[in-house]
Design a protein with these regions (language model features):
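Flexible hinge/switch segments at interdomain interfaces of large molecular machines
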Residues: 122-128
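Conserved Rossmann-fold dehydrogenase catalytic segment
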Residues: 84, 128-136
């Protein structure tokens, strides 16, 4: 849908065909997250993380009614093996994540909450052996609504958008 919208805005002839309803297949099974790829830091894929973070920021700017910040917490417990090493590893990873996002001075950079502070926000969290938690931000979307808006935009820009239709053959 996004590609159809973008291509139609550029004046190209565009047709998008969907066999079922818009956003009913892959989109409906998504996690609804617009994330920067924090887990890819473990495999040193800095280019992918940087690109994903830039795309996330772009979506937050151009579609704030459909993409919004969402905070995540990673609780740390003393019984976790190598919990001091894990804390250091997470700290370095989140600092790198913030840096790649270009948010070293932003309100959305990561932070650490000690166990007492964390329990005031999450009173039902298991607190025995809780050391604290790192909090960081990514984003969430209403993906089906976003797809529908993109289809509407593509239509307005001159694209041919058809759903409940099956593509059989391209005739030249």
């Amino acid at each position: 849908a996004w590609t159809a919208y973008d291509a139609a805005l550029r004046g190209l002839k565009v047709a998008i065909i969907e066999q079922n309803d818009w956003a009913s297949a892959t989109s409906s099974a998504s996690s609804k997250l617009i994330h920067g790829g924090l887990r890819y830091l473990e495999t040193y894929d800095f280019k992918l993380v940087s690109k994903s973070l830039k795309e996330r920021e772009l979506l937050l700017q151009i579609a704030p009614h459909r993409v919004w910040p969402l905070q995540f917490g990673m609780p740390l417990y003393t019984y976790q093996r190598n919990h001091y090493l894990n804390r250091l590893k997470l700290k370095i990873g989140l600092m790198l994540y913030d840096w790649l996002a270009g948010k070293t001075r932003s309100k959305t950079h990561h932070r650490y909450l000690d166990a007492e502070s964390l329990m005031t926000h999450f009173p039902y969290l298991r607190n025995n052996a809780l050391k604290g938690s790192f909090i960081y931000s990514d984003a969430q979307t209403d993906d089906a609504r976003l797809v529908l808006e993109l289809i509407a935009g593509a239509l307005d820009a001159g694209a041919c958008c058809v759903n409940y239709c099956q593509f059989i053959q391209f005739l030249a």
